[in-house]
């Protein structure tokens, strides 16, 4: 344990100043704590006061403090430590290793995981929102069901059965505010436990799981996906089985069978993150793990890739034995997601506008992918069959990221931003969705020039 992990609140000399805004006291407290952690006034390992004590000191209700602590734990800033209360989990000194918005303005955005915001279906969404608002019952404006609006859960269940092949009913669906919250709910519902996570994976996701008080063990990946045969006594496994993020391979049929057999024998759960599953361009669609074993697989989906990250809605298909615990954590986090947004998405799904938009964007992203692959001919490329980005294996990712930045292109290195828990393998994630249509070819040309300036062509691309 390092020195800064034993810091006590009483020794920090910290005063919290709450700036009241439209979000109220709880939001003000969350903002104040985030700021204190981010700027280092509350180092990692600092033990925060008990909720009752801080509520008394600040002159707010205990529920306000509890709600703020719960939300920040879900976001990875705090974690509950048995016998030691709530402690700071985020390390401000390591923030540079996490994926972040570029510190400068780039002409072209080729970072991963971002859809084309300029293609958001504004007219269709506005139409759905108007219909939802006009038809909303009065109780839709009151506190609602933590599971989500019945209208949306019904439409999501129908969509997931039809389009994604799930074995799911309305009562299995829990609506969340996106995958970040979904993962936090499950991590806290099972905490404290041992959680197996892919290596590499998003560092933010590791932070969320750890913040809930869980022990993380890493699962190495190879060309057949996560090495699930290495699983031991974990209670939870978090995977991107259909398209491993960031490397892009698919979990093989043999390993899927091994994983599900393991989960049945041990009574464990698997989170299958289907973060960009609607966008497959080559080969047949891959069936979901949940469709094979709904008693042990939690399916996680989100509107962030199909519509936009600003539509803060996600969904879980949760096994019956885990459902009550997940719903309880959702209620503790924020009670329920926004009712009007839920009703709008329900109408969007019901009217088939969602399907039309996904089909349109799938064709557009496929064309972009083809352009990018053509520019990268002779390079070591992974993950080309699906998704919103490629993984380009390089010898010096920092040099390539810098060369791209010099040409106004934002890309993201994997090793340098903390994706690897073990020995890092250099590579750059190149997104082809976020850049507007009119600028995409210019972005590809600029990135290809950056790549040519730092590394020669080598082996052929890999799918």
Language model: regions and residue ranges:
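Residue-level detector of anion-binding/catalytic polar loops
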Residues: 215, 269, 409-410
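Conserved core of the PLP fold type I
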Residues: 139-266, 278-298, 365, 396-397, ...
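N-terminal basic, amphipathic alpha-helical segments
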Residues: 1-132, 136, 141, 152, ...
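Active-site PLP attachment segment
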Residues: 293-325, 337-340
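A generic "structured core" feature
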Residues: 47, 199, 204-208, 259, ...
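Short glycine-rich anion-binding loops that position phosphate/pyrophosphate groups of nucleotides
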Residues: 113-116, 241-245, 305, 435
